[in-house]
Structures are given as structure tokens and as C-alpha cells.
Amino acid sequence: MDDAEVDHTKPIPAYYCCYLLRSTKQRTSLYIGSTPHPARRLAQHNGESKGGARKTAKDDKRPWEMVLLVEGFTSRVGALQFEWAWQNPRMSSQHPANRHQFDLETGDVAGTSGVQPSTEAGKAKHRGRGSRRSLKAHLEDLHLFLRSTYFSKWPLRLRFFNRDVYQLWTTWCDRVDALLPEHVRTILDGDCPKDHLSWADEPRVGSVEHIKVDYSDIYDYVEKSHFLLDDPSDLRCKICQAKIALSEELALVCPRASCYCISHLLCLSSRFLDHAEEPEQLVPIDGICPLCNKVIQWSTMMQELSLRTRGHNEFRAILRKAKRGRAKAHGSVHEASAPDGVASAVENPGSRAACVESASVGVSDSLDVDNHDDASLDENWTESLDLDPNPDELLNRPKDHKMESSRVEIIIDDSDCEEMEDLG
């Protein structure tokens, strides 16, 4: 299945992650999954709400805890691909045991990665350091996949909630010579120690229940872009200085609140790639804004662009919510509609009927993830999804793949086929 056929019909999701689950009663029992709503998914695993998975339903292992999240996925398909690779390292093409490509920086073909080449991927077992189902093994595989050819180009970040898991992670990072890509951030949360790794723009939330899974982090950004692009008669690209025709070209707005830089998507991406550390990089990760000279994240701009161009209901809901927020802060809708002219852009001229129609869609329903994302899947769901794409074949994929839309909706939903590891 072509990823584009799935991802290009909806905006980039507000949040999607892969997670590592651990039993609090049998700490050797582990479970890998993916979800757009960690708190809801954890409640399902613990039997507090309907859903969950058959392998986490045993009372002798509940309650479960999410000890680690891999965040930043820009599509559900991408999260499922990473989930599958993490569950099945011996079958993933990104694992050196299968691709026969070994990281020379480790200086150890088999010992450092913890696996040995085998012609029977998925069946061979390495007896040198114990079962591949241990927490240590999962963290080693995670480190390997984050620096693999395919996943190392993704804007991912790690969020640790448990001190012991983070300590085991740092022990492995100190041991292995290969380094993670610089853009892969580590966020220490839960009972992890506070230190310089706690990024200012990625604050601690304390627990899984407090993770934001809607678009609230970019409400102001969405409203600003709507205001700046509301009058397309005289929009000019900051890079090429040419006029921007919004009906024919895609435009990007700097996500920084005090910056009003507008540019062509192609102009800005070319500029970012020209200054990228890796010359063969195809998609930017971040770059310097040509106006404010601050580092801005490419994924954030793509999320706003996808909302503006493909998520019309979500986009209008964000604008309505922002308007009501200002009205509440200033005491009246009239007072909230005046400052800086931004509020005047909330109601799109000529689209009054569309706004009225969209008002029937609840803001929470539009901005939150669908409840179907946690629906149970049949046992053969992986057969219909290309979970292990070969990077060498990505550019040669046929463009006219046909698929059953009803099946796609099931496939890309939150996986109930995650893997549980039980050493007890």
C-alpha cells in the first residue's frame, strides 16, 4: 500500500506515538504498541475502559505502566511501521542482522548490536546475552532503529517516565559507539531526574494522563497563519521575493509568534536542505528562518499546512475556539475581535455558510483523535499493510496502487496486535 494514498487524505495527526508497556506486578512482562491517545490506551490495557488487547487482559499482570514513548510520528502508518520493526527486529529490513549492513562505528559486528547475521530472520536466536525479549534488548533495538537509514530521518523524540528505564538507556548509549541523530531529543518525565535534557519547548507533563493529544500547541500558530494569508493579493516569498499565488502554490508561515515570514514551500525546503548536514537528505528536519534567524521545525510547519489544506473542519474549529478564548479573556466577544486585527480573520469572508455548517461539528470532536483509533483489529491486519518498506525501493513504488478504503480505515487505526514480552 502506498503511504501517500493514506496520509494525503487527512491532516497530519495532532499526536501519535509508539510506547513500551511494562507490568507493575511482573516487571519482566513487556508490551509494544502505538496509539494517538496514550492515556486512553493505557486505561484500555488496564481494563478501566473497553478495548485494550487480549495479551494484556490478565489480572496477574495489571496494572500496566507506560515507561517510554517514542513521539513525533507524522502519520499513523509511520507509527505502525516503527511499531512493527520494534516488535520484530529479526524480520525488519532496518536491522543489520537482516540487511547484512553493520555499523562500523561500533567496532563489533555481532556483539555490539546484540545479534548475528542469519539467513532465517526471525527464527535465529542469539544465546550470548539472554533472551531478545528483555527490557535491555528492546532499548538496544530502539537505539538501532533510531539511527537506521529509514527512521533516522524522522522527527522523533523519546519521553521516559521511569528512572530505571532511563538509567538502562543511558548505560547502553554510553557503551555503544554509534550516536543517535542530533535531532532526536530526550525528554525526562515522570520520576526521571531533572537535568539539562529537559527541553524548554517540550516540557515535562508528569504522567501519561497529561500528554496533549490535540492541536492546542499550535492554536496560536494556526490563527496567525490564517490572518497573514487572509489577503492573498500581495503575498511575497521572503526567499525569492516573488508573489505567492495561494491558489496554485503552497506557502509556509514561520511558527514563531513574533515572526511574520512567509515563503514558498519549495523555496524554504530547498534552503533548509542546502544547509543540512547530510547532503543526501530528501526532507528537511529543521532550519533557520530567513527572517527571524531562529531554528524552526519542518514537521510543525507541515502540520499547520496540512490542517490548512486538508483539515478544513479542524482548521475552522481551531479558529472558533481561539476566538472564544479571547472573548472569555476580555469579557466579551466584541472586545476580543479588535486586537491586532487578528480576530477579524477568524471569519473567512465569503465562507459564512461553510463556517455555519462546520459549527455543527463539536470542537472537541474535531480536534481530538477519533475513538476508532483504539478499535480492536483482526489477527491478520499486518498482511494488508507494508510495514517494512525498503528504503532502496521507496522511489520505485508504483503510483497506481488500488486499495479497499474500508480495509484501510482498519489498518491505520491503533494496533491491537502489539507484542507482549513475558520472561516470567
UniProtKB/Swiss-Prot annotation:
A zinc finger (SLX1-type) spans 237-292. Its cofactor is a divalent metal cation. It comes from the Eukaryota. Residues 14-99 form the GIY-YIG domain. Transmembrane segments: none annotated. GO terms for molecular function: 5'-flap endonuclease activity; crossover junction DNA endonuclease activity; zinc ion binding. It is found in: Nucleus. One of its GO terms (cellular component) is Slx1-Slx4 complex. Keywords: DNA damage, DNA recombination, DNA repair, Endonuclease, Hydrolase, Metal-binding, Nuclease, Nucleus, Zinc, Zinc-finger. It is an enzyme of class 3 (hydrolase). Its main location: nucleus. One of its GO terms (biological process) is double-strand break repair via homologous recombination. Residues 394-407 have a biased composition (Basic and acidic residues). InterPro entries: GIY-YIG_endonuc, GIY-YIG_endonuc_sf, Slx1, SLX1_C, SLX1_endonuclease, Znf_RING/FYVE/PHD. Its EC number is 3.1.-.-. Gene3D superfamilies: GIY-YIG endonuclease, Zinc/RING finger domain, C3HC4 (zinc finger). HAMAP family: Endonuc_su_Slx1. Belongs to the SLX1 family. Forms a heterodimer with slx4. Catalytic subunit of the slx1-slx4 structure-specific endonuclease that resolves DNA secondary structures generated during DNA repair and recombination. Has endonuclease activity towards branched DNA substrates, introducing single-strand cuts in duplex DNA close to junctions with ss-DNA. PANTHER family: STRUCTURE-SPECIFIC ENDONUCLEASE SUBUNIT SLX1 (PTHR20208:SF10). This is Structure-specific endonuclease subunit slx1. The lineage of its organism: Eukaryota, Fungi, Dikarya, Ascomycota, Pezizomycotina.
